[in-house]
């Protein structure tokens, strides 16, 4: 029998379908939001209509934007899109057009005169003789931001409550990062802040119809891996089962977002996030509303599209954006040839991790509906069962692991990746599939420093040799649900050893880790290695709680300590 989740037990139209109507056999628009409850404003939330969202930087001052990004004024393309225009962007752009061809025009001076720079998140002012656990506890206040109001023309979106940012170049909240950060907040006793994070995401769902990639205007066209149901489950473990009913309206809207557009699909067709396979099964993919270069990686995307000689640039841009929505930006999973970014085809892939998370969302909706005393619980449970059957039919490789499915070529991937453990994390795997997946993962992905992301070295950051904290936790938690405690412990302890070794040497936690014996930070990708780091902090605390004998609570050796910066 499949395991149920083991822990606690396009916006949607305001008019919900009749309560308790059976969902099976009805159109997607009928079942994405059954029995919708009137949304009750969350305590302390901003309930007035938000100000009109400013256009993204590439649309607000297009000629200036392209000149800055093409001219590579800044090492990181995200840097400029986070700058604050000091006056109306249209006027700034007009002045640029009037001046830029004049002799002696200095683009950098023009930018400095018209924009305010956003500094990176600093986390290096903590005493350097603290142990790892105490260091993480001291990091939380440095990563907290409160932006209930933002200046006019900012790309930042206001949120009603404080929130935790990852660190470094990531000065805003991120959707899927935040679940792993919240695990650590709860473990640190910061349950109020964890609840505030959850309320912020509920606010984003109510305001924009979905949780965007992050709270920036240029992230609104997509989401990220749907972990809102896990956040609700986490908070229910703190406050009790009533949490499920409190967030039921937002859970339903979240589901509506991911299922929107599937009403009229015929077998072999897709719309937005929804794919109807040849046998009529409905599963999901990653998607983005826009098919233009990402503002935060504009030059990178235009160069990638230029290398794809046989494809329209818009298709490449959409797939790059969908890859960003996946959180795995980027990986061989999305590449047609397994190595070249310009062959990216994310929207052709039905990912095992996304569909596992949506199964958990359906199960959580069933649980939340049960608290209302309606039959909708049975309906969502039936939808979850349908998804499980489709996953077993299309995303299970007979070689012994879960994998991604290409719905356009009707082929199943033969690559073992860390995503194969998401069905265990979501509780949808059978005992046999869980055991065989564990065997495959041990043989293909176990490294000296933990769980590898994939077994391919491509230069992309979500491939060999990098290890990522969220994937370590998905693995450890998922394996433990199915009694694979030995492999879970091996992965968890090896990753803790990597975290501790780098911490002892450099007194910081980073976004990703190399998994070789030298315990270095990870590489690859579009930007330099970032420290802070939200999800690493959260997962490290969870692993320390599970495996305290690993000795990762020691303070860095004094001989390894960096000198304190000189006083100004």
From Swiss-Prot:
HAMAP family in the cross-refs: Peripl_trehalase
Function of the molecule: Provides the cells with the ability to utilize trehalose at high osmolarity by splitting it into glucose molecules that can subsequently be taken up by the phosphotransferase-mediated uptake system.
Biological process terms in GO annotation: cellular hyperosmotic response; trehalose catabolic process
Protein name as annotated: Periplasmic trehalase
Protein location: Periplasm
Gene transcribed to yield this protein: treA
Gene Ontology cellular-component terms listed: periplasmic space
Keywords: Glycosidase, Hydrolase, Periplasm, Signal
Documented EC number(s): 3.2.1.28
Active-site residues annotated for this sequence: 329, 511
UniProt-recorded Gene Ontology molecular function terms: alpha,alpha-trehalase activity
NCBIfam families: PRK13270.1, PRK13271.1, PRK13272.1
Membership in a protein family: Belongs to the glycosyl hydrolase 37 family.
UniProt: substrate binding residues: 169, 176-177, 213, 222-224, 294-296, 327, 526
Leader sequence segment: 1-38
PANTHER family: TREHALASE
Catalytic activity annotation: alpha,alpha-trehalose + H2O = alpha-D-glucose + beta-D-glucose
Enzyme class: hydrolase
